[in-house]
Amino acid sequence: MAIENNNNGVNFCTVKRPKTKIVCTLGPASRSVPMIEKLLRAGMNVARFNFSHGSHDYHQETIDNLRQAMESTGILCAVMLDTKGPEIRTGFLKDAKPVQLKQGQEITISTDYSIKGDESMICMSYKKLAEDVKPQSVILCADGQITFTVLSCDKENGLDRCRCENTAVLGERKNVNLPGVIVDLPTLTDKDKDDILNWGVPNHIDMIALSFVRKGSDLVEVRKLLGEHAKNILLMSKVENQEGVANFDDILLNSDAFMVARGDLGMEIPIEKIFLAQKVMIYKCNIQGKPVVTATQMLESMIKSPRPTRAEATDVANAVLDGTDCVMLSGETAAGAYPDLAVGTMAKICIEAESTIDYPDVFKRIMSNAPVPMSPLESLASSAVRTANSAKAALILVLTRGGSTAKLVAKYRPGMPILSVVVPEIKTDSFDWTCSDESPARHSLIFRGLVPVLHAGSARASHEESTEEALDFALQHAKTKGLCKQGDSVVALHRVGTASVIKIVTVK
C-alpha cells in the first residue's frame, strides 16, 4: 500500500498542471516542511491559513515551513489569511462531556456564555439571540447536524425555549447558523483586526478571505484598516448569509476576488438552491473578470479515504465547467489522511474537465458581456486571446509590471496557458537600485490559466534590450516547463516604448 501511494505522489509531480488553481488549507496534517513540499509538487497554488483555529505562533511556524518548502522546491505559492469572522458558537459543557439530545426534547438556550451546558440548558455566544429570533425560527448547530425550533423567547433574561428536531450528540463550541435572521455583528471582529494587522501584514500575506461579508461597504472598512498595505493585499469576499446574497452585486463590485463558501451558505439558503447560487456567482465573477474560488466539501471523503466519491469527482469537474478560477480543499489537506493525494486527485479531475471546454464559445460569451466602450488595455488583452485562438498558439506570453494586463488576458479564458512574466520595476536614485516586490506574481496564482514567472532583468539595459531579453528568458522558461516546444506558435503581448504590441513568435 505504501508503495502504491508513493507512486501516486511521483506521478502527480510529472503530470501537467491544470489551468484551474488549487487552494489548500494548511493544518495539523500538512504543516511540516516535507508535506508542504509534496503539496507544492502535487499542484498547490495558494496556502490557506484558517484563523478560526490556531494561535499566531502556530500559524507563524506553518508559514515559516511554507517559505522553506517554497525555497527548496522553487515553486511559488500565494498566502491567504481566512478570517474567523463574526461566528456564533455554542458554549462549553459540564465536565467537557458531549450532550445527548433526543428528538422532541425541549431545551433552554441562554446568551450567558459563562454557563457550562448540559441536557437542560446550553449557551450560545450571540448576545441578541433572544431579541432577533422569534417563535418558529430555526437554529442550526454543528454544520446543520442539529436543528432547534424556537418555542418562546425571554428577551429580558436572554433565554430561548427550543425543541430539538433530531437525535444527536452536541460537542463543545460548535458553530451556529440562524437562517433568515439578519445578525447584528460586525464583519471584522477585534480578533480579525488583530490577526490581519499583527500577523497578516508583517508576514506579507497576498490575500484576505473575509468571512460573512454582508454589503459592499464592509470592504471599504477593511481597506481603511489596511491603509498603505491595501494595495498589496487582495480582498476576497465570502458571502455566507441571505443579506450577503441580496447584496451580491454591490459586494462583487468592491471585491478583488470572491469565494463561493458553500458551507455556511448551505445553512442559510435551501440546500436544493446551492447549485444555482454557485453557477450565478461564478458567472457574474467571470463577466467582471474577478477570480472566484469554489470551496467546501469538494473531496470531503478523502479526509479518510484514498479515493473520492463519484459525486465529489463530478462536483469538482462541474465547478471547472461552471468557470471557477480555483477549487479549494479544507479538511482534506488540513486534517486528512491523504493531503498530497487529495491535491493530485483534484489536479487530475481539473485537467480532464478543462479538456472538454469549448474555449471559442466561452470567449464569445465573455465578449458579448464586455464593457462598451472597452478600455484600451482590455481591448488589447481580448485581441491577444482572439489571435491565440485563431493561430492555434501553444501559449500566450505577457510581459507585465503590475500584472493587470495578464489578468485581463485571463478574463477571456484562452484555451492555452498564459505565461505572465513579471518584470519588477527598477526604481533608482543616485545611490541605489531597488526592485518592486513580487506580489503581482503571487496575486496571479488565483487566476485560471495564469502562470507567473519572475524575471529580474538587467537594470542597466535599454528598454528594447530588456524586452527582448525578457522574451527570450520567457520562451526558454516555457520550454523547460513543457508549456511549449520547438516549432510552436506563441502569442506575445508587450510594450515597445509607449505602444503595446501583439506578435506571433515561433519557438526556436
Curated annotation (Swiss-Prot):
Disulfide bonds: none annotated. It is an enzyme of class 2 (transferase). Mg(2+) binds at residues 240, 264. GO terms for biological process: glycolytic process. Pathway: Carbohydrate degradation; glycolysis; pyruvate from D-glyceraldehyde 3-phosphate: step 5/5. Its cofactor is Mg(2+); K(+). This is Pyruvate kinase, cytosolic isozyme. Keywords: ATP-binding, Cytoplasm, Glycolysis, Kinase, Magnesium, Metal-binding, Nucleotide-binding, Potassium, Pyruvate, Transferase. Substrate binds at residues 48, 263-264, 296. The lineage of its organism: Eukaryota, Viridiplantae, Streptophyta, Embryophyta, Tracheophyta. It comes from Nicotiana tabacum. PANTHER family: PYRUVATE KINASE. Homotetramer. ATP binds at residues 50-53, 89, 174. Its EC number is 2.7.1.40. InterPro entries: Pyr_Knase, Pyrv/PenolPyrv_kinase-like_dom, Pyrv_kinase-like_dom_sf, Pyrv_Knase-like_insert_dom_sf, Pyrv_Knase_AS, Pyrv_Knase_brl, Pyrv_Knase_C, Pyrv_Knase_C_sf. The keyword Transmembrane does not apply. Its main location: cytoplasm. Belongs to the pyruvate kinase family. K(+) binds at residues 50, 52, 82-83. GO terms for molecular function: ATP binding; kinase activity; magnesium ion binding; potassium ion binding; pyruvate kinase activity.
